[in-house]
Amino acid sequence: MGVANDSSPEYQWMSPHRLSDTVILGDCLYFNNIMSQLDLHQNWAPSVRLLNYFKNFNRETLLKIEENDYINSSFFQQKDKRFYPINDDFYHISTGGYGIVFKIDNYVVKFVFEATKLYSPMETTAEFTVPKFLYNNLKGDEKKLIVCALAMGLNYKLTFLHTLYKRVLNMLLLLIQTMDGQELSLRYSSKVFLKAFNERKDSIKFVKLLSHFYPAVINSNINVINYFNRMFHFFEHEKRTNYEYERGNIIIFPLALYSADKVDTELAIKLGFKSLVQYIKFIFLQMALLYIKIYELPRCDNFLHADLKPDNILLFDSNEPIIIHLKDKKFVFNERIKSALNDFDFSQVAGIINKKIKNNFKVEHNWYYDFHFFVHTLLKTYPEIEKDIEFSTALEEFIMCTKTDCDKYRLKVSILHPISFLEKFIMRDIFSDWINGRN
Protein backbone atom coordinates (compact mmCIF):
# COMPACT_ATOMS: atom_id res chain seq x y z
CA MET A 1 0.00 0.00 0.00
CA GLY A 2 1.38 3.40 -1.03
CA VAL A 3 2.12 6.22 1.34
CA ALA A 4 -0.73 8.76 1.44
CA ASN A 5 0.07 12.35 0.62
CA ASP A 6 -1.96 15.55 0.78
CA SER A 7 -3.29 14.90 -2.74
CA SER A 8 -5.17 11.85 -1.49
CA PRO A 9 -8.40 11.57 0.50
CA GLU A 10 -6.56 9.49 3.09
CA TYR A 11 -4.47 12.53 4.05
CA GLN A 12 -7.01 13.61 6.66
CA TRP A 13 -6.23 10.55 8.77
CA MET A 14 -2.48 11.13 8.90
CA SER A 15 -0.81 12.66 11.94
CA PRO A 16 2.47 14.14 10.70
CA HIS A 17 3.45 15.88 13.94
CA ARG A 18 2.40 14.75 17.39
CA LEU A 19 2.70 16.82 20.56
CA SER A 20 1.31 14.77 23.42
CA ASP A 21 -2.39 14.44 22.60
CA THR A 22 -2.30 17.28 20.06
CA VAL A 23 -1.62 17.13 16.33
CA ILE A 24 -0.31 19.74 13.89
CA LEU A 25 -1.26 19.58 10.22
CA GLY A 26 0.59 21.74 7.71
CA ASP A 27 3.51 24.08 8.33
CA CYS A 28 4.86 23.74 11.86
CA LEU A 29 6.87 26.96 11.52
CA TYR A 30 3.77 29.07 10.97
CA PHE A 31 1.93 27.30 13.74
CA ASN A 32 4.70 27.47 16.32
CA ASN A 33 5.34 31.13 15.51
CA ILE A 34 1.73 32.02 16.26
CA MET A 35 1.54 29.78 19.31
CA SER A 36 4.69 31.31 20.77
CA GLN A 37 2.77 34.60 21.02
CA LEU A 38 -0.14 33.07 22.95
CA ASP A 39 -0.26 32.35 26.65
CA LEU A 40 -2.62 29.38 26.82
CA HIS A 41 -2.16 29.08 30.57
CA GLN A 42 -2.84 32.66 31.64
CA ASN A 43 -5.20 32.96 34.56
CA TRP A 44 -6.38 35.74 36.81
CA ALA A 45 -7.17 36.34 40.46
CA PRO A 46 -10.70 35.45 41.61
CA SER A 47 -13.48 37.78 40.47
CA VAL A 48 -14.08 38.98 44.02
CA ARG A 49 -10.62 40.57 44.02
CA LEU A 50 -11.48 42.37 40.79
CA LEU A 51 -14.63 43.69 42.43
CA ASN A 52 -12.59 44.93 45.42
CA TYR A 53 -10.13 46.56 43.00
CA PHE A 54 -12.89 48.64 41.41
CA LYS A 55 -14.02 49.83 44.84
CA ASN A 56 -10.95 52.07 44.71
CA PHE A 57 -12.56 54.09 41.89
CA ASN A 58 -15.53 56.38 41.58
CA ARG A 59 -16.90 58.80 39.01
CA GLU A 60 -14.43 61.48 40.04
CA THR A 61 -11.35 59.27 39.66
CA LEU A 62 -12.64 58.00 36.31
CA LEU A 63 -13.08 61.60 35.19
CA LYS A 64 -9.40 62.26 35.88
CA ILE A 65 -8.47 59.28 33.68
CA GLU A 66 -10.76 60.56 30.93
CA GLU A 67 -9.00 63.93 31.04
CA ASN A 68 -5.65 62.24 30.43
CA ASP A 69 -4.18 62.64 26.94
CA TYR A 70 -3.24 58.97 26.59
CA ILE A 71 -5.46 56.86 24.37
CA ASN A 72 -4.83 53.42 22.87
CA SER A 73 -6.59 53.61 19.51
CA SER A 74 -6.73 49.82 19.23
CA PHE A 75 -9.64 49.90 21.69
CA PHE A 76 -11.88 51.66 19.21
CA GLN A 77 -14.12 49.33 17.22
CA GLN A 78 -12.36 48.21 14.02
CA LYS A 79 -15.01 49.75 11.78
CA ASP A 80 -14.26 53.11 13.44
CA LYS A 81 -11.90 55.31 11.41
CA ARG A 82 -10.06 56.11 14.65
CA PHE A 83 -9.08 52.46 15.15
CA TYR A 84 -5.38 51.70 14.74
CA PRO A 85 -3.55 48.53 15.84
CA ILE A 86 -0.65 50.11 17.69
CA ASN A 87 0.56 46.82 19.20
CA ASP A 88 1.40 43.42 17.72
CA ASP A 89 -1.65 41.96 19.42
CA PHE A 90 -4.36 39.49 18.51
CA TYR A 91 -7.37 41.57 17.43
CA HIS A 92 -10.81 40.00 17.56
CA ILE A 93 -12.47 40.36 14.15
CA SER A 94 -15.37 37.91 14.24
CA THR A 95 -17.23 35.35 16.28
CA GLY A 96 -19.75 33.02 14.67
CA GLY A 97 -21.45 29.80 15.58
CA TYR A 98 -18.38 27.77 14.69
CA GLY A 99 -15.35 29.87 15.49
CA ILE A 100 -13.72 32.86 17.16
CA VAL A 101 -11.43 34.68 14.75
CA PHE A 102 -8.48 37.00 15.41
CA LYS A 103 -6.06 38.93 13.25
CA ILE A 104 -2.34 39.23 13.99
CA ASP A 105 0.11 40.74 11.52
CA ASN A 106 -0.64 39.15 8.12
CA TYR A 107 -2.44 36.13 9.52
CA VAL A 108 -5.89 35.14 10.67
CA VAL A 109 -6.16 32.75 13.60
CA LYS A 110 -9.40 30.85 14.13
CA PHE A 111 -10.25 29.03 17.34
CA VAL A 112 -12.95 26.38 17.06
CA PHE A 113 -14.40 24.69 20.13
CA GLU A 114 -15.22 21.10 19.21
CA ALA A 115 -17.77 18.86 20.87
CA THR A 116 -15.32 16.04 21.50
CA LYS A 117 -18.10 13.66 22.52
CA LEU A 118 -19.50 13.84 18.99
CA TYR A 119 -16.31 13.77 16.93
CA SER A 120 -12.75 12.62 17.40
CA PRO A 121 -10.08 15.30 16.73
CA MET A 122 -9.24 13.79 13.34
CA GLU A 123 -12.90 13.95 12.33
CA THR A 124 -12.83 17.76 12.56
CA THR A 125 -10.11 18.45 9.99
CA ALA A 126 -12.23 19.20 6.89
CA GLU A 127 -11.41 22.91 7.08
CA PHE A 128 -7.77 22.00 6.46
CA THR A 129 -7.85 18.77 4.47
CA VAL A 130 -10.57 19.48 1.89
CA PRO A 131 -9.11 22.73 0.46
CA LYS A 132 -5.60 21.24 0.59
CA PHE A 133 -6.78 18.17 -1.31
CA LEU A 134 -8.53 20.32 -3.93
CA TYR A 135 -5.58 22.68 -4.33
CA ASN A 136 -3.18 19.80 -4.91
CA ASN A 137 -5.41 18.08 -7.46
CA LEU A 138 -6.66 21.02 -9.51
CA LYS A 139 -4.23 21.70 -12.37
CA GLY A 140 -5.04 25.18 -13.64
CA ASP A 141 -5.48 28.69 -12.29
CA GLU A 142 -8.75 27.62 -10.69
CA LYS A 143 -6.68 26.38 -7.74
CA LYS A 144 -5.99 30.05 -6.94
CA LEU A 145 -9.67 30.42 -6.04
CA ILE A 146 -9.32 28.33 -2.87
CA VAL A 147 -8.17 29.52 0.56
CA CYS A 148 -5.85 26.93 2.09
CA ALA A 149 -5.01 27.05 5.77
CA LEU A 150 -1.31 27.41 6.50
CA ALA A 151 -1.53 25.13 9.51
CA MET A 152 -4.01 23.52 11.85
CA GLY A 153 -3.56 22.37 15.43
CA LEU A 154 -5.94 19.71 16.71
CA ASN A 155 -7.16 18.98 20.21
CA TYR A 156 -5.63 22.01 21.93
CA LYS A 157 -6.82 23.21 25.30
CA LEU A 158 -8.78 26.42 24.67
CA THR A 159 -10.21 27.15 28.11
CA PHE A 160 -8.15 30.36 28.20
CA LEU A 161 -10.50 31.98 25.65
CA HIS A 162 -13.59 31.52 27.79
CA THR A 163 -11.66 32.56 30.89
CA LEU A 164 -10.43 35.69 29.10
CA TYR A 165 -13.95 36.50 27.93
CA LYS A 166 -15.33 36.26 31.49
CA ARG A 167 -12.52 38.45 32.81
CA VAL A 168 -13.19 41.16 30.20
CA LEU A 169 -16.94 40.92 30.76
CA ASN A 170 -16.50 41.40 34.51
CA MET A 171 -14.17 44.35 33.92
CA LEU A 172 -16.70 46.01 31.62
CA LEU A 173 -19.56 45.39 34.05
CA LEU A 174 -17.70 46.96 36.96
CA LEU A 175 -16.38 49.83 34.85
CA ILE A 176 -19.84 50.74 33.56
CA GLN A 177 -21.33 50.46 37.06
CA THR A 178 -18.63 52.77 38.40
CA MET A 179 -19.28 55.26 35.60
CA ASP A 180 -22.99 55.26 36.48
CA GLY A 181 -22.44 55.44 40.24
CA GLN A 182 -24.16 52.10 40.78
CA GLU A 183 -23.47 49.49 43.44
CA LEU A 184 -20.78 47.11 42.20
CA SER A 185 -21.97 43.62 41.33
CA LEU A 186 -20.98 40.83 38.96
CA ARG A 187 -24.61 39.95 38.34
CA TYR A 188 -25.99 41.22 35.07
CA SER A 189 -28.83 41.26 32.62
CA SER A 190 -27.72 40.52 29.05
CA LYS A 191 -30.06 43.13 27.61
CA VAL A 192 -29.03 45.85 30.07
CA PHE A 193 -25.31 45.15 29.68
CA LEU A 194 -25.35 45.14 25.87
CA LYS A 195 -27.34 48.37 25.78
CA ALA A 196 -24.87 50.07 28.14
CA PHE A 197 -21.82 48.76 26.27
CA ASN A 198 -23.13 49.65 22.81
CA GLU A 199 -23.97 53.17 23.98
CA ARG A 200 -20.40 53.74 25.18
CA LYS A 201 -18.12 51.70 22.89
CA ASP A 202 -17.59 54.52 20.36
CA SER A 203 -17.03 57.23 22.96
CA ILE A 204 -13.49 58.59 23.15
CA LYS A 205 -13.86 58.92 26.94
CA PHE A 206 -14.78 55.24 27.24
CA VAL A 207 -11.84 54.25 25.03
CA LYS A 208 -9.54 56.26 27.31
CA LEU A 209 -10.86 54.27 30.27
CA LEU A 210 -10.27 51.02 28.39
CA SER A 211 -6.76 52.22 27.56
CA HIS A 212 -6.15 52.42 31.30
CA PHE A 213 -8.02 49.38 32.64
CA TYR A 214 -7.50 46.74 29.94
CA PRO A 215 -3.69 46.59 30.41
CA ALA A 216 -4.05 46.81 34.19
CA VAL A 217 -6.87 44.30 34.66
CA ILE A 218 -6.54 41.99 31.65
CA ASN A 219 -2.82 42.27 30.89
CA SER A 220 -3.10 40.19 27.71
CA ASN A 221 -2.02 40.60 24.09
CA ILE A 222 -5.46 39.36 23.03
CA ASN A 223 -7.77 42.32 22.41
CA VAL A 224 -11.43 41.24 22.45
CA ILE A 225 -12.99 44.70 22.81
CA ASN A 226 -13.55 44.86 19.06
CA TYR A 227 -16.92 43.25 18.30
CA PHE A 228 -17.18 42.18 21.92
CA ASN A 229 -20.97 41.97 21.62
CA ARG A 230 -20.56 39.11 19.10
CA MET A 231 -18.38 37.21 21.54
CA PHE A 232 -20.97 37.93 24.25
CA HIS A 233 -23.75 36.42 22.12
CA PHE A 234 -21.60 33.35 21.45
CA PHE A 235 -20.73 32.53 25.04
CA GLU A 236 -24.05 33.60 26.55
CA HIS A 237 -26.28 31.76 24.07
CA GLU A 238 -28.73 29.51 25.87
CA LYS A 239 -27.75 26.47 23.80
CA ARG A 240 -24.25 26.70 25.33
CA THR A 241 -25.44 26.97 28.93
CA ASN A 242 -23.84 23.66 29.91
CA TYR A 243 -21.10 23.71 27.29
CA GLU A 244 -17.59 22.77 28.36
CA TYR A 245 -15.15 25.15 26.67
CA GLU A 246 -12.35 22.67 27.00
CA ARG A 247 -10.67 21.64 23.76
CA GLY A 248 -10.74 22.48 20.09
CA ASN A 249 -8.74 23.37 17.03
CA ILE A 250 -6.55 26.32 16.05
CA ILE A 251 -6.38 27.17 12.35
CA ILE A 252 -4.04 29.71 10.73
CA PHE A 253 -4.93 31.38 7.44
CA PRO A 254 -3.39 34.10 5.26
CA LEU A 255 -4.98 37.51 5.83
CA ALA A 256 -7.41 38.59 3.09
CA LEU A 257 -8.24 42.11 1.94
CA TYR A 258 -11.97 41.75 2.58
CA SER A 259 -14.76 39.22 2.62
CA ALA A 260 -16.90 39.49 -0.49
CA ASP A 261 -19.95 40.81 1.37
CA LYS A 262 -18.04 43.90 2.56
CA VAL A 263 -17.78 45.39 -0.96
CA ASP A 264 -20.21 48.21 -1.73
CA THR A 265 -20.53 50.36 -4.85
CA GLU A 266 -17.75 52.74 -3.81
CA LEU A 267 -15.29 49.95 -3.05
CA ALA A 268 -16.22 47.98 -6.18
CA ILE A 269 -15.34 50.98 -8.35
CA LYS A 270 -12.16 51.53 -6.33
CA LEU A 271 -11.21 47.91 -7.08
CA GLY A 272 -11.60 48.56 -10.80
CA PHE A 273 -15.13 47.35 -11.57
CA LYS A 274 -17.57 49.37 -13.64
CA SER A 275 -20.32 48.83 -11.11
CA LEU A 276 -21.29 46.80 -8.07
CA VAL A 277 -23.27 44.40 -10.26
CA GLN A 278 -20.22 43.73 -12.43
CA TYR A 279 -18.32 42.85 -9.26
CA ILE A 280 -21.09 40.43 -8.24
CA LYS A 281 -20.94 38.78 -11.67
CA PHE A 282 -17.18 38.47 -11.17
CA ILE A 283 -17.40 36.56 -7.88
CA PHE A 284 -20.29 34.41 -9.15
CA LEU A 285 -18.35 33.46 -12.28
CA GLN A 286 -15.16 32.61 -10.41
CA MET A 287 -17.05 30.41 -7.94
CA ALA A 288 -18.93 28.70 -10.78
CA LEU A 289 -15.69 27.94 -12.62
CA LEU A 290 -14.15 26.57 -9.43
CA TYR A 291 -17.06 24.18 -8.92
CA ILE A 292 -17.04 23.05 -12.54
CA LYS A 293 -13.33 22.28 -12.38
CA ILE A 294 -13.75 20.40 -9.10
CA TYR A 295 -16.50 18.28 -10.63
CA GLU A 296 -14.16 17.39 -13.51
CA LEU A 297 -11.79 15.67 -11.05
CA PRO A 298 -12.11 11.89 -10.62
CA ARG A 299 -14.49 10.90 -7.81
CA CYS A 300 -15.13 14.55 -6.93
CA ASP A 301 -18.67 14.89 -8.24
CA ASN A 302 -19.86 14.64 -4.63
CA PHE A 303 -18.22 17.94 -3.64
CA LEU A 304 -20.28 20.10 -1.31
CA HIS A 305 -19.19 23.20 0.53
CA ALA A 306 -22.53 23.42 2.34
CA ASP A 307 -22.17 27.11 3.22
CA LEU A 308 -21.45 28.98 -0.01
CA LYS A 309 -22.27 32.63 0.66
CA PRO A 310 -20.59 36.04 0.19
CA ASP A 311 -19.02 36.21 3.65
CA ASN A 312 -17.33 32.84 3.05
CA ILE A 313 -15.67 34.19 -0.09
CA LEU A 314 -12.50 36.19 0.55
CA LEU A 315 -10.78 38.72 -1.69
CA PHE A 316 -7.02 38.74 -2.20
CA ASP A 317 -4.63 40.71 -4.38
CA SER A 318 -4.11 39.21 -7.83
CA ASN A 319 -0.81 40.17 -9.43
CA GLU A 320 -1.26 38.32 -12.71
CA PRO A 321 -4.13 37.31 -14.99
CA ILE A 322 -6.16 34.27 -13.98
CA ILE A 323 -6.95 32.11 -17.02
CA ILE A 324 -9.34 29.17 -16.82
CA HIS A 325 -10.12 26.97 -19.83
CA LEU A 326 -13.53 25.37 -20.25
CA LYS A 327 -14.30 23.40 -23.41
CA ASP A 328 -13.59 25.78 -26.32
CA LYS A 329 -13.78 28.90 -24.16
CA LYS A 330 -11.15 30.73 -22.19
CA PHE A 331 -12.12 32.83 -19.18
CA VAL A 332 -9.61 35.59 -18.49
CA PHE A 333 -9.59 37.68 -15.31
CA ASN A 334 -7.33 40.74 -15.42
CA GLU A 335 -8.74 42.28 -12.25
CA ARG A 336 -6.43 43.40 -9.47
CA ILE A 337 -8.22 41.06 -7.05
CA LYS A 338 -9.35 37.45 -7.02
CA SER A 339 -12.07 35.75 -5.01
CA ALA A 340 -11.30 32.59 -3.05
CA LEU A 341 -13.60 30.14 -1.32
CA ASN A 342 -13.06 29.85 2.42
CA ASP A 343 -14.47 28.02 5.46
CA PHE A 344 -14.66 24.36 4.46
CA ASP A 345 -15.75 23.23 7.91
CA PHE A 346 -18.85 21.42 6.57
CA SER A 347 -17.46 20.40 3.20
CA GLN A 348 -16.96 16.98 1.66
CA VAL A 349 -15.21 15.70 -1.45
CA ALA A 350 -14.16 12.34 -2.89
CA GLY A 351 -13.40 9.94 -0.03
CA ILE A 352 -13.08 12.66 2.62
CA ILE A 353 -16.19 12.02 4.66
CA ASN A 354 -17.38 14.83 6.91
CA LYS A 355 -19.56 13.58 9.75
CA LYS A 356 -20.84 17.09 10.43
CA ILE A 357 -22.46 17.34 7.01
CA LYS A 358 -23.50 13.69 7.02
CA ASN A 359 -25.48 14.22 10.21
CA ASN A 360 -27.13 17.42 8.95
CA PHE A 361 -28.39 16.25 5.55
CA LYS A 362 -31.33 13.88 5.30
CA VAL A 363 -31.33 13.69 1.48
CA GLU A 364 -28.64 13.59 -1.20
CA HIS A 365 -27.31 16.90 -2.54
CA ASN A 366 -24.75 18.12 -5.05
CA TRP A 367 -23.41 21.46 -6.33
CA TYR A 368 -26.95 22.75 -6.91
CA TYR A 369 -27.61 22.82 -3.16
CA ASP A 370 -24.68 25.21 -2.73
CA PHE A 371 -25.63 27.52 -5.60
CA HIS A 372 -29.29 27.62 -4.60
CA PHE A 373 -28.17 28.93 -1.20
CA PHE A 374 -25.52 31.18 -2.79
CA VAL A 375 -28.00 32.94 -5.08
CA HIS A 376 -30.46 33.48 -2.23
CA THR A 377 -27.75 35.11 -0.11
CA LEU A 378 -26.46 37.19 -3.03
CA LEU A 379 -29.91 38.63 -3.64
CA LYS A 380 -30.35 39.36 0.05
CA THR A 381 -26.91 40.96 0.42
CA TYR A 382 -27.11 42.93 -2.82
CA PRO A 383 -30.62 44.19 -3.70
CA GLU A 384 -28.86 46.23 -6.41
CA ILE A 385 -28.86 43.07 -8.55
CA GLU A 386 -32.53 43.68 -9.35
CA LYS A 387 -31.55 46.74 -11.39
CA ASP A 388 -29.85 44.43 -13.89
CA ILE A 389 -32.93 42.70 -15.30
CA GLU A 390 -31.03 40.18 -17.41
CA PHE A 391 -28.77 39.06 -14.56
CA SER A 392 -31.47 38.97 -11.87
CA THR A 393 -33.84 37.03 -14.13
CA ALA A 394 -31.11 34.51 -14.91
CA LEU A 395 -30.28 34.02 -11.23
CA GLU A 396 -33.90 33.19 -10.47
CA GLU A 397 -33.34 29.90 -12.32
CA PHE A 398 -31.42 28.74 -9.24
CA ILE A 399 -34.18 29.56 -6.74
CA MET A 400 -37.40 28.24 -8.22
CA CYS A 401 -38.41 26.94 -4.81
CA THR A 402 -41.34 27.02 -2.39
CA LYS A 403 -41.70 27.03 1.38
CA THR A 404 -42.16 23.28 1.35
CA ASP A 405 -38.80 22.54 -0.29
CA CYS A 406 -36.71 25.49 0.96
CA ASP A 407 -36.14 26.59 4.56
CA LYS A 408 -34.06 29.69 5.34
CA TYR A 409 -32.61 29.55 1.82
CA ARG A 410 -31.56 25.90 2.17
CA LEU A 411 -33.00 23.10 0.07
CA LYS A 412 -34.85 20.43 2.02
CA VAL A 413 -35.41 18.21 -1.01
CA SER A 414 -32.96 16.50 -3.33
CA ILE A 415 -32.52 18.34 -6.65
CA LEU A 416 -29.49 16.90 -8.46
CA HIS A 417 -29.03 19.04 -11.55
CA PRO A 418 -25.96 17.94 -13.55
CA ILE A 419 -22.95 20.26 -13.52
CA SER A 420 -23.60 20.92 -17.23
CA PHE A 421 -26.44 23.19 -16.03
CA LEU A 422 -23.83 25.49 -14.48
CA GLU A 423 -21.48 25.17 -17.47
CA LYS A 424 -24.18 26.36 -19.88
CA PHE A 425 -25.21 29.15 -17.53
CA ILE A 426 -21.80 30.83 -17.46
CA MET A 427 -21.49 30.73 -21.26
CA ARG A 428 -24.19 33.40 -21.54
CA ASP A 429 -23.51 36.97 -22.61
CA ILE A 430 -24.00 38.01 -18.99
CA PHE A 431 -20.36 37.04 -18.48
CA SER A 432 -19.04 38.25 -21.84
CA ASP A 433 -16.58 40.61 -20.12
CA TRP A 434 -14.45 37.60 -19.21
CA ILE A 435 -15.09 35.11 -22.03
CA ASN A 436 -12.10 34.73 -24.33
CA GLY A 437 -10.32 37.64 -22.70
CA ARG A 438 -12.66 40.39 -23.87
CA ASN A 439 -11.94 42.48 -20.80
Swiss-Prot record:
Source organism, top-level taxon:
Viruses
The catalytic activity of this protein is classed by the Enzyme Commission as 2.7.11.1
Catalytic activity from the UniProt record: L-seryl-[protein] + ATP = O-phospho-L-seryl-[protein] + ADP + H(+); L-threonyl-[protein] + ATP = O-phospho-L-threonyl-[protein] + ADP + H(+)
Q: Which residues form the Protein kinase domain?
A: 87-439
Q: Tell where it localizes.
A: Host endoplasmic reticulum; Host endoplasmic reticulum-Golgi intermediate compartment
A cellular component term from Gene Ontology for this protein is:
host cell endoplasmic reticulum
Protein name (record): Serine/threonine-protein kinase 2
Q: Which organism is it from?
A: Variola virus (isolate Human/India/Ind3/1967)
* Annotated gene: OPG054
